[in-house]
From Swiss-Prot:
Function: Catalyzes the decarboxylation of orotidine 5'-monophosphate (OMP) to uridine 5'-monophosphate (UMP).
Name of the gene: pyrF
Keyword check for Lyase: yes
Keywords: Decarboxylase, Lyase, Pyrimidine biosynthesis
PROSITE patterns on file: OMPDECASE (PS00156)
Protein name listed in UniProt: Orotidine 5'-phosphate decarboxylase
Family, similarity comment: Belongs to the OMP decarboxylase family. Type 1 subfamily.
């Protein structure tokens, strides 16, 4: 794998709340990561302006708002995300088949022809969760089995891929095929701590397992030199 290919796999989690920080990180890392993730805190604080600033700096955007509501509401919200020109957005697989399918139908209807639409990802089981967490909400399945069940449901609804722990990537590949996108948080380079993620791998391990994109935040943002940290992650991926 080339360095350019490795860079494109990295999604930097822009976990900030100040608009000035958006420009700072976008300008600093636009040549060193493949995409920027805008989550709930940043989007609530700054709104679409955060997305536009990243785009102005030449960056691509994963709008990580994890929609989970009645089908029509999620479909309309996803259309608005698509109209912002983001590359990735997501919804919760636990919202069910109808919610996911109606969303994909709305996107395909509104983005037919030459206009590209964003790829839509379904959230499976959050990487901060384990089997005790699932039991607490009445789910008795083991985490890997639940993840695969949700991934297969998402694929049947027409969703482009899933967000899942790197530990479940190979199982998802077996169940859903090589063309189904898998985006993995819970990735920690060899030089970083695990923080609050419970099901983790190194970048090289996750890519080897078949991950298409790696979501990485604190190991880059908290480093003394964020650019150097991003470059080290690229080195790890290339080295395999």
């Amino acid at each position: 794998m080339t360095r350019e290919e490795a860079i494109k796999k990295i999604i930097f989690a822009m976990d900030v709340k100040e608009f000035s920080d958006v420009q700072y990180w976008a300008e600093l890392l636009s040549q060193h990561v493949g995409m920027f993730k805008v989550g709930k805190q940043l989007y609530t604080a700054c709104g679409p302006a955060a997305v536009r600033m990243i785009q102005k700096c030449g960056g691509e955007v994963f709008l990580d708002l994890k929609y989970h509501d009645i089908p029509n509401t999620v479909a309309m919200a996803t259309l608005e995300a698509a109209n912002l020109g983001v590359q990735l957005c997501d919804l919760h697989a636990m919202g069910g088949y109808e919610m996911m399918n109606k969303t994909m139908e709305a996107l395909d209807k509104n983005f037919s022809g030459c206009t590209p639409r964003p790829k839509v990802l379904a959230i499976t089981v959050l990487t901060s969760s384990n089997e005790e967490t699932l039991r607490g909400i009445g789910i008795e399945l083991p985490v890997p089995e639940m993840v695969v069940k949700l991934a297969k449901l998402a694929k049947s609804a027409g969703v482009d891929g899933v967000v899942a722990s790197p530990q479940e990537v190979e199982l998802i590949r077996e169940a859903c095929g090589k063309d189904f996108l898998v985006v993995t948080p819970g990735v920690r380079p060899s030089f970083a701590s695990a923080d609050d993620q419970k099901r983790i791998m190194t970048p090289a391990e996750a890519v080897k397992a078949g991950a298409d994109y790696l979501v990485i935040g604190r190991p880059i943002a908290a480093a003394q030199s964020p650019v150097e940290a991003a470059q080290k992650i690229v080195d790890e991926i290339v080295a395999g």
